[in-house]
Amino acid sequence: TIDXPEDFKHYEVQLPDVKIHYVREGAGPTLLLVEKPEIAIDRIKTAFRKPDNIHGGFNYYRANIRPDAALWTDLDH
């Protein structure tokens, strides 16, 4: 999970081969910028192809890139 200050303006997250940036101006909406989006999309597609992966890998991304995400839940495991 990510612990970011509530008033952050720029925050980076490094996933394998992909860097994700959160950018926010004041109280405005948060922008999500992904370097190498083709790699990020490939990671998601690969997660869908894993046997018995009923959630498609999105729990990993939800828990790891949202700055306001809750901690891991039983569903995430």
UniProtKB/Swiss-Prot annotation:
Transmembrane segments: none annotated. Its EC number is 3.3.2.10. GO terms for molecular function: epoxide hydrolase activity. The keyword Electron transport does not apply. The keyword Hydrolase applies. Keywords: Aromatic hydrocarbons catabolism, Hydrolase. GO terms for biological process: catabolic process. It catalyses: an epoxide + H2O = an ethanediol. Monomer. This enzyme acts on aliphatic epoxides. Its substrates include epichlorohydrin, epibromohydrin, epoxyoctane and styrene epoxide. This is Epoxide hydrolase. It comes from Pseudomonas sp. (strain AD1).
